[in-house]
């Protein structure tokens, strides 16, 4: 047996529809498309989202907000993630090296979430008020 000799068991698959081969076949003349109308024509089909003249869903729902393009370049860092960085200084490069943020991130903000158990110096990152207090309470400092 070879790959080009593989075939399904006889009778296991229905034979293909042979359209337009005489009226006795049941699929002759109009070929299963009915009479006239958009869907009987070649290349004729309704546009995606068309609901037969009813107001489409996309137009029934209100417009709402927008997606910020800058969002993909800004990261949020929790306090417990700062502890994963090796060394005392935490900046963008150190966060990327520790695999905490993606390579394309341009700016990051430290937020008060989790706990910080060692002193670190945060450089060049934005820091929330609560996170700033937590960093200084742990013996670290924030440099802008």
Swiss-Prot record:
Residues 21-31 have a biased composition (Gly residues). One of its GO terms (cellular component) is cytosolic large ribosomal subunit. One of its GO terms (molecular function) is structural constituent of ribosome. InterPro entries: Ribosomal_uL15, Ribosomal_uL15/eL18, Ribosomal_uL15/eL18_sf, Ribosomal_uL15_bac-type, Ribosomal_uL15_CS. Residues 1-58 are annotated as: Disordered. The keyword RNA-binding applies. It comes from the Bacteria. PROSITE patterns: RIBOSOMAL_L15. The keyword Chaperone does not apply. Keywords: Ribonucleoprotein, Ribosomal protein, RNA-binding, rRNA-binding. Pfam families: Ribosomal_L27A. GO terms for biological process: translation. Belongs to the universal ribosomal protein uL15 family. Part of the 50S ribosomal subunit. PANTHER family: 50S RIBOSOMAL PROTEIN L15 (PTHR12934), LARGE RIBOSOMAL SUBUNIT PROTEIN UL15M (PTHR12934:SF11). Binds to the 23S rRNA. This is Large ribosomal subunit protein uL15.
């Amino acid at each position: 047996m070879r790959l080009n000799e593989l075939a399904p068991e006889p009778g296991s698959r229905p034979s293909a529809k042979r359209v337009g081969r005489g009226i006795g076949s049941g699929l002759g003349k109009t070929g299963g498309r009915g009479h006239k109308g958009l869907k009987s024509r070649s290349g004729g089909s309704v546009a995606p989202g068309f609901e037969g003249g009813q107001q489409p869903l996309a137009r029934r729902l209100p417009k709402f907000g927008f997606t910020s393009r800058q969002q993909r370049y800004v990261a949020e860092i929790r306090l417990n993630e700062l502890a994963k960085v090796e060394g005392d200084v935490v900046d963008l490069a150190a966060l990327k090296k520790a695999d905490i943020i993606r390579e394309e991130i341009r700016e990051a903000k430290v937020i008060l979430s989790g706990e910080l158990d060692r002193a670190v110096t945060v450089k060049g990152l934005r820091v929330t008020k609560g996170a700033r207090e937590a960093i200084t309470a742990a013996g670290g400092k924030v440099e802008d």
